[in-house]
Amino acid sequence: MSAPIDVPIRDETIRLGQLLKLAGVVDDGAMAREVIERGVVAVNGEIDTRRGRQVRPGDVVTFEDETLNVT
């Protein structure tokens, strides 16, 4: 597992799919949708299959071997 990545967001929340793109762990929205719908993305330890899930600073998103800390 690689070191956690801090991902600063400019608003109070960001959609899960947008966060994956912003962090650079997926190439585009289609890939974000695919991995989220496959059930391989977790928010705060729980699998979430909703691309529009709102995440906020303090949330931790995991995908494959990446850990994203929303800041």
Where are these regions (language model features)?
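A short, structure-level motif marking secondary-structure boundaries and short turns
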Residues: M1-S2, V43
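A positively charged, amphipathic N-terminal helix/segment that binds anionic biomolecules
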Residues: P4-D6, V60-T71
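A detector for short, charged/polar N-terminal pre-domain segments
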Residues: S2-I14
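A basic, amphipathic helix-loop patch mediating RNA/tRNA/ribosome contacts
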Residues: I14-P57
